[in-house]
Amino acid sequence: MAAGSGSRMGADRPKQFLELGGKAVLQRTIEVFLEADPDITVVTVLPEQFISYWKDYCYSRNFICPQILVKGGITRFHSVRNALARIPEGALVAVHDGVRPLITPAKIRELFDLAENCPGVVPVVPCVDTMKVLQPSESKEIWSEIPGCEADRSELFGAQTPQVFQSEIIKAAYGMPYDTAFTDDASVVSRYGKSLSYTMGERLNIKITTPEDLILARAVTAALEEGYSL
């Protein structure tokens, strides 16, 4: 999934096209999946106005990767629905954020293996910070706690991607009407009534959303290229 606009990044182009170790973030993300499975079918969802940009980029960098290019929708939900229209029955579908380039091939293969025997599997990481349930106050810079509403950190996990599903299940789930409560694919499939499995993700599988995220991703990429291993 690379149909986001990247408005929080404050850059002159969407964050999936920003440079990470000499390559576009999106190229690095796709390359990890190809390393995990060279025969994988890649469906790339992009903002309509950047499809030609991506084609030109791939040509100029000699990035040879058969891709099905799909126009993004008005929300992430609609973008995924557009992509699923190109997916056959009887397949495993990994829906991944194009701006999570630090996922490892080993984790991708593990998720596909787990999804063979369940409706879907979602990688998660435990929350390490103390969590607070807050509400806005009169000041834009200050929030206040909601009385009697406590968050138990031991029960809280952050969901990552790729989230992997049986194609029949996720395609049927995305046939439901859109709801603003759908924040990821797991929330859609859960609403459809399917019980999902969750497994440990990777702490470095960050989603590049802000300038600070890009700084961290560049530091990790540089360390890996110098020989450090995850």
Predicted regions and their residues:
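Conserved beta-loop-beta/alpha segment of the NTase-like Rossmann-fold superfamily
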Residues: I68, I74-E138, Q160
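Hydrophobic packing residues within well-ordered alpha-helices of enzyme cores
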Residues: M9, W54-K55, L111, I170, ...
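Conserved alpha/beta core of the MobA/IspD/sugar-nucleotide pyrophosphorylase nucleotidyltransferase superfamily
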Residues: I74, F157-L230
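Short helix-capping segments at alpha-helix termini
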Residues: D37-P38, Y59-P66, E89
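Residues at the starts of beta-strands that form the adenosine-phosphate
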Residues: I40-V42, G120, S195
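Short beta-strand segments
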Residues: M1-A3, T44-V45, H96, P123-P126, ...
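Short, flexible, basic/aromatic active-site loop/helix in glycosyltransferases
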Residues: K132-T161
